[in-house]
């Protein structure tokens, strides 16, 4: 993947100003609510029976934060994202058996929550850079499935 200097700057800026404790839980909660079949991978998280329960679930919040911190690794290794996520790809495919399409669903939810947080600052250029970055991460996480 080729990154322009502008794309690198946008991605770095987004993640350097991101409120992980806010964005992470909101993005994962949105994914679990909008795409309820994704809940099957979180059966150990307790009550996921409705939107209110999911939004208030401490395990969901903690995992959402963990996911965003995992994306930090990609931001710091933009020239080698596939290798950065190779071990995580193996874990999700061979042990957890996560449908790789779920990574795309979560990345879409992250984009929506970031867009809502940034408001007018979430320009088309910002969206393009963020979605490109997340698509590369999603591809890397799905490598083990191929």
Swiss-Prot record:
Question: Which BP terms in the Gene Ontology apply to this protein?
Answer: hydrogen peroxide catabolic process
| Residues of the Globin domain | 2-146
Its GO CC terms are: blood microparticle; haptoglobin-hemoglobin complex; hemoglobin complex
| Highest taxon, organism lineage | Eukaryota
Q: Where are the transmembrane segments?
A: none
Please indicate if the UniProt record lists Iron as a keyword: yes
Note the subunit structure: Hb 1 is a heterotetramer of two alpha-1 and two beta-1 chains.
Q: In which tissues is it expressed?
A: Red blood cells.
List other remarks.
Answer: This fish has two hemoglobins: Hb1 (major) and Hb2 (about 15-20% of the total). They display the Root effect and the alkaline Bohr effect, which is enhanced by organophosphate and to a lesser extent by chloride.
PROSITE patterns (UniProt xref):
GLOBIN (PS01033)
Molecular functions per Gene Ontology: haptoglobin binding; heme binding; metal ion binding; organic acid binding; oxygen binding; oxygen carrier activity; peroxidase activity
InterPro entries per the UniProt record, alphabetical = Globin, Globin-like_sf, Globin/Proto, Hemoglobin_b, Hemoglobin_oxygen_transport
UniProt-recorded name of the protein: Hemoglobin subunit beta-1
Q: Provide the alphabetized UniProt keywords.
A: Heme, Iron, Metal-binding, Oxygen transport, Transport
- Family designation: Belongs to the globin family.
Q: Which organism is it from?
A: Gobionotothen gibberifrons (Humped rockcod)
């Amino acid at each position: 993947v080729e990154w322009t200097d502008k794309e690198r700057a946008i991605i770095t800026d987004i993640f350097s100003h991101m409120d992980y404790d806010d964005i992470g839980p909101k993005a994962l909660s949105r994914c679990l609510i909008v795409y309820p079949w994704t809940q099957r991978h979180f059966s150990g998280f307790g009550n996921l029976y409705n939107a209110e329960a999911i939004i208030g679930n401490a395990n969901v919040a903690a995992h959402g934060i963990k996911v965003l911190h995992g994306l930090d690794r990609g931001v710091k290794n933009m020239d080698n994202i596939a290798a950065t996520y190779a071990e995580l790809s193996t874990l999700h495919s061979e042990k957890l058996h996560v449908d790789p399409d779920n990574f795309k669903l979560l990345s879409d939810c992250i984009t929506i929550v970031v867009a809502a947080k940034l408001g007018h600052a979430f320009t088309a250029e910002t969206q393009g850079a963020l979605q490109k970055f997340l698509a590369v991460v999603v591809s890397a996480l799905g490598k083990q499935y191929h």
